[in-house]
Protein backbone atom coordinates (compact mmCIF):
# COMPACT_ATOMS: atom_id res chain seq x y z
CA UNK A 1 0.00 0.00 0.00
CA UNK A 2 2.87 2.35 0.84
CA UNK A 3 4.49 1.70 -2.55
CA UNK A 4 1.21 2.38 -4.36
CA UNK A 5 0.74 5.63 -2.45
CA UNK A 6 4.17 6.83 -3.60
CA UNK A 7 2.71 7.05 -7.10
CA UNK A 8 -0.32 8.99 -5.87
CA UNK A 9 1.45 12.19 -4.86
CA UNK A 10 -1.39 14.37 -6.15
CA UNK A 11 -3.81 12.79 -3.68
CA UNK A 12 -4.21 13.00 0.09
CA UNK A 13 -3.46 9.43 1.18
CA UNK A 14 -4.32 8.07 4.63
CA UNK A 15 -3.71 4.62 6.09
CA UNK A 16 -5.50 2.32 8.50
CA UNK A 17 -4.79 -1.17 9.69
CA UNK A 18 -7.62 -3.64 9.21
CA UNK A 19 -10.22 -2.98 11.90
CA UNK A 20 -13.28 -4.84 13.27
CA UNK A 21 -16.57 -3.55 11.88
CA UNK A 22 -19.03 -5.72 13.80
CA UNK A 23 -19.91 -6.29 17.45
CA UNK A 24 -18.99 -9.95 17.02
CA UNK A 25 -15.47 -9.21 15.76
CA UNK A 26 -14.91 -6.62 18.47
CA UNK A 27 -15.92 -9.19 21.09
CA UNK A 28 -13.56 -11.79 19.60
CA UNK A 29 -10.67 -9.33 19.86
CA UNK A 30 -11.58 -8.12 23.35
CA UNK A 31 -12.43 -11.41 25.04
CA UNK A 32 -10.41 -14.07 23.19
CA UNK A 33 -6.98 -14.58 21.66
CA UNK A 34 -8.31 -15.89 18.35
CA UNK A 35 -7.27 -12.73 16.49
CA UNK A 36 -3.80 -12.48 18.05
CA UNK A 37 -2.10 -13.82 14.93
CA UNK A 38 -3.74 -11.20 12.71
CA UNK A 39 -3.36 -7.45 12.15
CA UNK A 40 -6.70 -6.97 13.93
CA UNK A 41 -4.93 -7.37 17.26
CA UNK A 42 -1.53 -6.94 18.87
CA UNK A 43 1.32 -7.50 18.36
CA UNK A 44 0.81 -7.22 14.59
CA UNK A 45 -1.47 -4.19 14.93
CA UNK A 46 1.26 -2.30 16.80
CA UNK A 47 3.89 -3.48 14.32
CA UNK A 48 1.96 -2.12 11.35
CA UNK A 49 1.23 1.14 13.17
CA UNK A 50 4.93 1.53 13.97
CA UNK A 51 5.71 1.10 10.27
CA UNK A 52 3.28 3.88 9.35
CA UNK A 53 4.76 6.20 11.97
CA UNK A 54 8.37 5.46 11.00
CA UNK A 55 7.62 6.37 7.38
CA UNK A 56 5.66 9.50 8.25
CA UNK A 57 2.40 8.20 6.78
CA UNK A 58 -0.95 9.69 7.78
CA UNK A 59 -2.97 7.37 10.03
CA UNK A 60 -6.76 7.28 10.22
CA UNK A 61 -7.54 4.09 12.12
CA UNK A 62 -11.11 3.01 11.32
CA UNK A 63 -11.35 5.73 8.66
CA UNK A 64 -13.36 8.28 10.63
CA UNK A 65 -11.33 11.47 10.06
CA UNK A 66 -12.22 12.02 6.42
CA UNK A 67 -14.71 11.28 3.70
CA UNK A 68 -12.81 9.23 1.13
CA UNK A 69 -13.11 9.20 -2.66
CA UNK A 70 -11.45 5.79 -2.91
CA UNK A 71 -10.57 3.02 -0.46
CA UNK A 72 -7.87 0.48 -1.38
CA UNK A 73 -8.05 -2.82 0.50
CA UNK A 74 -5.69 -5.78 0.77
CA UNK A 75 -8.52 -7.96 2.12
CA UNK A 76 -12.18 -8.07 1.22
CA UNK A 77 -13.00 -10.41 4.08
CA UNK A 78 -13.71 -7.50 6.43
CA UNK A 79 -15.17 -4.42 4.72
CA UNK A 80 -16.90 -1.81 6.89
CA UNK A 81 -20.45 -0.91 5.86
CA UNK A 82 -19.50 2.78 5.68
CA UNK A 83 -17.21 2.05 2.72
CA UNK A 84 -19.63 -0.02 0.67
CA UNK A 85 -20.94 3.03 -1.20
CA UNK A 86 -17.40 4.36 -1.74
CA UNK A 87 -15.25 3.47 -4.75
CA UNK A 88 -13.17 0.45 -3.73
CA UNK A 89 -10.16 -1.41 -5.12
CA UNK A 90 -8.77 -4.68 -3.76
CA UNK A 91 -5.06 -5.43 -4.16
CA UNK A 92 -3.70 -8.93 -3.66
CA UNK A 93 -0.89 -8.88 -1.12
CA UNK A 94 0.36 -12.45 -1.22
CA UNK A 95 -0.56 -16.12 -1.23
CA UNK A 96 -4.16 -17.21 -0.67
CA UNK A 97 -4.74 -20.15 1.68
CA UNK A 98 -6.04 -23.48 0.41
CA UNK A 99 -9.79 -23.94 0.36
CA UNK A 100 -10.97 -26.36 3.04
CA UNK A 101 -14.26 -28.06 3.90
CA UNK A 102 -14.92 -25.13 6.23
CA UNK A 103 -14.34 -22.68 3.37
CA UNK A 104 -17.10 -24.36 1.38
CA UNK A 105 -19.48 -24.37 4.34
CA UNK A 106 -18.90 -20.68 5.05
CA UNK A 107 -19.42 -19.81 1.39
CA UNK A 108 -22.55 -21.96 1.03
CA UNK A 109 -24.19 -20.61 4.19
CA UNK A 110 -23.34 -17.00 3.36
CA UNK A 111 -21.43 -16.52 6.62
CA UNK A 112 -18.85 -13.74 7.02
CA UNK A 113 -15.74 -14.94 5.13
CA UNK A 114 -13.49 -14.65 8.20
CA UNK A 115 -15.39 -17.61 9.68
CA UNK A 116 -13.16 -19.77 7.48
CA UNK A 117 -10.34 -18.98 9.92
CA UNK A 118 -7.85 -18.36 7.11
CA UNK A 119 -7.42 -16.32 3.92
CA UNK A 120 -8.99 -18.88 1.58
CA UNK A 121 -11.86 -16.51 0.74
CA UNK A 122 -9.76 -13.37 0.39
CA UNK A 123 -10.35 -11.97 -3.08
CA UNK A 124 -13.44 -14.10 -3.60
CA UNK A 125 -16.24 -12.06 -2.01
CA UNK A 126 -16.94 -9.82 -5.04
CA UNK A 127 -17.54 -6.89 -2.65
CA UNK A 128 -14.99 -4.48 -4.12
CA UNK A 129 -15.39 -2.69 -7.45
CA UNK A 130 -12.00 -3.64 -8.92
CA UNK A 131 -9.63 -6.51 -8.09
CA UNK A 132 -5.88 -6.27 -8.82
CA UNK A 133 -4.37 -9.75 -9.01
CA UNK A 134 -0.85 -11.15 -8.98
CA UNK A 135 -1.16 -13.24 -12.13
CA UNK A 136 -3.44 -14.74 -14.74
CA UNK A 137 -3.51 -17.89 -12.61
CA UNK A 138 -4.85 -16.00 -9.60
CA UNK A 139 -7.33 -14.15 -11.81
CA UNK A 140 -8.77 -17.50 -12.83
CA UNK A 141 -8.75 -18.66 -9.19
CA UNK A 142 -10.75 -15.68 -7.94
CA UNK A 143 -13.18 -15.90 -10.85
CA UNK A 144 -13.79 -19.59 -10.12
CA UNK A 145 -14.47 -18.79 -6.48
CA UNK A 146 -17.05 -16.04 -6.86
CA UNK A 147 -15.56 -12.74 -8.03
CA UNK A 148 -16.90 -11.26 -11.26
CA UNK A 149 -14.24 -11.86 -13.96
CA UNK A 150 -14.95 -8.41 -15.39
CA UNK A 151 -13.64 -6.86 -12.15
CA UNK A 152 -10.32 -8.72 -12.24
CA UNK A 153 -7.20 -7.02 -13.62
CA UNK A 154 -3.76 -8.67 -13.68
CA UNK A 155 -1.40 -5.99 -12.36
CA UNK A 156 1.20 -7.99 -10.48
CA UNK A 157 1.77 -7.18 -6.82
CA UNK A 158 4.40 -4.96 -5.16
CA UNK A 159 7.17 -6.86 -3.32
CA UNK A 160 6.79 -9.90 -5.60
CA UNK A 161 7.19 -8.40 -9.07
CA UNK A 162 10.96 -7.90 -9.35
CA UNK A 163 12.60 -10.82 -7.60
CA UNK A 164 15.80 -10.79 -9.68
CA UNK A 165 16.87 -7.69 -7.74
CA UNK A 166 17.58 -9.93 -4.73
CA UNK A 167 20.37 -11.76 -6.55
CA UNK A 168 22.58 -8.74 -5.80
CA UNK A 169 23.09 -9.06 -2.04
CA UNK A 170 25.70 -9.31 0.67
CA UNK A 171 24.28 -12.26 2.60
CA UNK A 172 27.41 -14.22 3.57
CA UNK A 173 26.26 -17.80 2.88
CA UNK A 174 25.45 -19.63 -0.37
CA UNK A 175 24.44 -23.03 -1.77
CA UNK A 176 22.46 -24.24 1.24
CA UNK A 177 19.03 -25.83 1.53
CA UNK A 178 16.76 -23.16 2.98
CA UNK A 179 13.68 -23.87 5.09
CA UNK A 180 11.12 -21.06 5.50
CA UNK A 181 8.65 -21.84 8.27
CA UNK A 182 5.03 -20.73 8.73
CA UNK A 183 3.36 -19.42 11.90
CA UNK A 184 0.65 -22.10 11.94
CA UNK A 185 0.75 -22.70 15.68
CA UNK A 186 0.67 -18.99 16.45
CA UNK A 187 -2.47 -18.68 14.31
CA UNK A 188 -4.18 -21.67 15.96
CA UNK A 189 -3.63 -24.20 13.18
CA UNK A 190 -2.24 -27.69 13.73
CA UNK A 191 1.36 -28.39 12.85
CA UNK A 192 3.71 -31.28 13.51
CA UNK A 193 6.92 -29.25 13.47
CA UNK A 194 9.27 -32.13 14.38
CA UNK A 195 7.96 -34.13 11.41
CA UNK A 196 8.43 -31.12 9.11
CA UNK A 197 12.02 -30.63 10.27
CA UNK A 198 12.79 -34.33 9.78
CA UNK A 199 11.36 -34.20 6.24
CA UNK A 200 13.49 -31.12 5.46
CA UNK A 201 16.59 -32.90 6.80
CA UNK A 202 15.83 -35.84 4.51
CA UNK A 203 15.52 -33.53 1.48
CA UNK A 204 18.78 -31.78 2.38
CA UNK A 205 20.51 -35.17 2.48
CA UNK A 206 23.63 -33.96 4.24
CA UNK A 207 23.82 -30.52 2.64
CA UNK A 208 24.14 -27.34 4.72
CA UNK A 209 20.74 -26.22 6.04
CA UNK A 210 19.41 -22.77 6.88
CA UNK A 211 16.11 -22.11 8.67
CA UNK A 212 14.40 -18.73 8.40
CA UNK A 213 11.67 -18.46 11.03
CA UNK A 214 8.41 -16.66 10.40
CA UNK A 215 8.42 -13.25 12.17
CA UNK A 216 5.37 -14.21 14.27
CA UNK A 217 6.86 -17.41 15.64
CA UNK A 218 7.86 -18.14 19.21
CA UNK A 219 11.59 -18.05 18.63
CA UNK A 220 12.68 -20.03 21.69
CA UNK A 221 10.39 -22.97 20.89
CA UNK A 222 11.25 -23.01 17.19
CA UNK A 223 15.00 -22.83 17.81
CA UNK A 224 14.88 -25.62 20.39
CA UNK A 225 13.07 -27.90 17.93
CA UNK A 226 15.59 -27.20 15.18
CA UNK A 227 18.53 -27.87 17.52
CA UNK A 228 16.90 -31.17 18.48
CA UNK A 229 15.95 -32.51 15.06
CA UNK A 230 18.30 -30.83 12.55
CA UNK A 231 22.04 -31.54 12.16
CA UNK A 232 24.64 -29.66 14.16
CA UNK A 233 25.76 -26.53 12.35
CA UNK A 234 22.33 -25.76 10.93
CA UNK A 235 21.93 -22.00 10.50
CA UNK A 236 18.87 -20.40 12.12
CA UNK A 237 17.64 -16.84 11.50
CA UNK A 238 14.66 -15.04 12.98
CA UNK A 239 15.44 -11.69 11.37
CA UNK A 240 17.18 -10.65 8.18
CA UNK A 241 16.26 -10.31 4.52
CA UNK A 242 14.41 -13.49 3.59
CA UNK A 243 14.58 -12.74 -0.13
CA UNK A 244 18.36 -12.45 -0.04
CA UNK A 245 18.55 -15.79 1.75
CA UNK A 246 16.35 -17.38 -0.93
CA UNK A 247 18.43 -15.84 -3.72
CA UNK A 248 21.55 -17.54 -2.33
CA UNK A 249 20.03 -20.96 -1.62
CA UNK A 250 20.23 -24.02 -3.87
CA UNK A 251 16.82 -25.38 -2.85
CA UNK A 252 13.86 -23.92 -0.93
CA UNK A 253 11.50 -25.78 1.41
CA UNK A 254 8.34 -24.00 2.54
CA UNK A 255 5.02 -24.76 4.19
CA UNK A 256 2.31 -22.18 3.43
CA UNK A 257 4.61 -19.22 2.86
CA UNK A 258 4.26 -16.64 0.08
CA UNK A 259 8.06 -16.54 -0.17
CA UNK A 260 7.86 -19.71 -2.24
CA UNK A 261 7.04 -17.33 -5.09
CA UNK A 262 10.45 -15.72 -4.73
CA UNK A 263 12.04 -19.13 -5.16
CA UNK A 264 9.89 -19.88 -8.21
CA UNK A 265 10.65 -16.50 -9.80
CA UNK A 266 14.37 -17.15 -9.37
CA UNK A 267 14.16 -20.64 -10.85
CA UNK A 268 14.94 -22.47 -7.59
CA UNK A 269 13.80 -26.00 -6.87
CA UNK A 270 11.00 -25.50 -4.34
CA UNK A 271 8.88 -27.59 -1.98
CA UNK A 272 5.53 -26.54 -0.51
CA UNK A 273 2.41 -27.89 1.16
CA UNK A 274 0.69 -26.54 -1.96
CA UNK A 275 1.01 -28.30 -5.31
CA UNK A 276 4.19 -26.83 -6.81
CA UNK A 277 3.00 -27.06 -10.42
CA UNK A 278 -0.14 -25.14 -9.44
CA UNK A 279 2.01 -22.55 -7.66
CA UNK A 280 3.98 -22.00 -10.86
CA UNK A 281 0.70 -21.15 -12.62
CA UNK A 282 -0.27 -18.78 -9.79
CA UNK A 283 3.18 -17.21 -9.43
CA UNK A 284 3.09 -13.37 -9.56
CA UNK A 285 4.07 -11.83 -12.88
CA UNK A 286 7.53 -10.28 -13.02
CA UNK A 287 7.38 -6.79 -14.50
CA UNK A 288 10.53 -5.19 -13.15
CA UNK A 289 8.79 -3.62 -10.16
CA UNK A 290 6.06 -1.80 -12.09
CA UNK A 291 3.06 -3.21 -10.18
CA UNK A 292 2.68 -0.35 -7.68
CA UNK A 293 2.78 2.22 -10.47
CA UNK A 294 0.29 0.26 -12.57
CA UNK A 295 -2.12 -0.11 -9.65
CA UNK A 296 -1.78 3.61 -8.91
CA UNK A 297 -2.76 4.33 -12.53
CA UNK A 298 -5.97 2.38 -12.00
CA UNK A 299 -6.59 4.30 -8.76
CA UNK A 300 -6.15 7.65 -10.50
CA UNK A 301 -8.42 6.72 -13.38
CA UNK A 302 -11.13 5.45 -11.06
CA UNK A 303 -10.99 8.48 -8.75
CA UNK A 304 -11.24 10.83 -11.72
CA UNK A 305 -14.11 8.92 -13.34
CA UNK A 306 -17.29 10.94 -12.98
CA UNK A 307 -19.83 8.33 -14.00
CA UNK A 308 -21.53 5.59 -12.02
CA UNK A 309 -19.18 3.08 -10.38
CA UNK A 310 -20.52 0.13 -12.33
CA UNK A 311 -19.81 1.91 -15.64
CA UNK A 312 -16.09 2.46 -15.05
CA UNK A 313 -14.64 -0.87 -16.17
CA UNK A 314 -16.65 -0.98 -19.39
CA UNK A 315 -14.86 2.16 -20.62
CA UNK A 316 -11.45 1.58 -18.99
CA UNK A 317 -8.49 0.13 -20.88
CA UNK A 318 -5.62 -1.10 -18.73
CA UNK A 319 -2.26 -0.29 -20.29
CA UNK A 320 0.41 -1.55 -17.90
CA UNK A 321 3.99 -0.43 -17.85
CA UNK A 322 6.21 -3.45 -18.31
CA UNK A 323 9.97 -3.84 -17.94
CA UNK A 324 11.34 -6.72 -20.07
CA UNK A 325 12.07 -9.71 -17.84
CA UNK A 326 13.92 -12.89 -18.85
CA UNK A 327 11.91 -16.10 -18.91
CA UNK A 328 12.45 -18.26 -15.83
CA UNK A 329 14.10 -21.64 -16.26
CA UNK A 330 12.78 -23.84 -13.46
CA UNK A 331 15.07 -26.18 -11.58
Regions from the PLM with identified roles:
Residues 82-90, 97, 238-283:
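A donor-sugar binding/catalytic signature common to diverse glycosyltransferases
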Residues 3-8, 154-226:
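Conserved catalytic-core segment of nucleotide-activated headgroup transferases in glycan assembly
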Residues 282-331:
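C-terminal amphipathic helix plus adjacent low-complexity
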Residues 1-162, 260:
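Active-site and donor-binding regions of nucleotide-sugar-utilizing enzymes
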Residues 19-20, 32-42, 204-239:
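Catalytic donor nucleotide-activated moiety binding site of glycosyltransferases and closely related
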Residues 24-26, 98-106, 162-167, 245-247, ...:
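Short, charged, surface-exposed secondary-structure boundary motifs
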Residues 126-131, 208, 248-251:
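Short active-site oxyanion
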Residues 78-80, 95-97, 183-191, 216-218, ...:
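Short acidic, S/G/P-rich loop/turn micro-motifs used as interaction or catalytic elements
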